Design a protein with these regions (language model features):
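Bacterial Sec-dependent N-terminal signal peptides
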Residues: 1-24
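Surface-exposed, glycine-biased beta-strand/turn segments
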Residues: 18-87, 91-96, 104-109, 117, ...
Length: 140
């Protein structure tokens, strides 16, 4: 019985700690060329939910250009009067996805892509899922 219990504990220990995932240390670059000060942290308690990202202060300036934290492709674009407002999702080769929300303006290429879809749908609110070859982005 002791041997069986020991074996079960070892197996349980293996499965519990083999789930630990190493995240890349120097893979991602800052998304803006300003000092990064946070106004909202991941997981902080909001009125009816936990905050699902980090909010970066923009020194009171609107329209600061946002850069992709790493190379990848735009996998989702969502424009809504709620939530993130204008948001873009970038999938990176390492399997991570970065989300950029509360965006004032997209790049010219992405703006044209969105506007064409909005006119086609005849709606400001839109959710798009571009193919991986359509909107490639580079780090920075």
């Amino acid at each position: 019985m002791k041997n069986l219990l020991s074996i079960l504990l070892i197996i349980n220990y293996h499965f519990a700690f083999s789930q630990e995932k190493k995240y890349p240390q120097d893979y991602f670059a800052p998304p803006m060329d300003i000092p990064l000060y946070l106004s909202g942290n991941f997981g902080e308690i909001r009125t009816n939910h936990f905050h699902a990202g980090i909010d970066i202060k923009t020194q009171g300036v609107e329209g600061i250009p946002i850069k992709s934290a790493a190379e990848g492709f735009v996998s989702r674009i969502k424009i809504s009067p709620y939530g993130y407002g204008k948001a873009i999702y970038v999938v990176h080769p390492n399997g991570y996805t970065t989300v950029y929300g509360h965006i004032q303006k997209f790049s010219e290429t992405i703006e044209k892509y969105i506007k064409a879809a909005q006119y086609k749908k005849e709606s400001f609110s839109i959710e798009l899922f571009p193919m991986s070859s359509e909107l490639q982005v580079k780090k920075g």
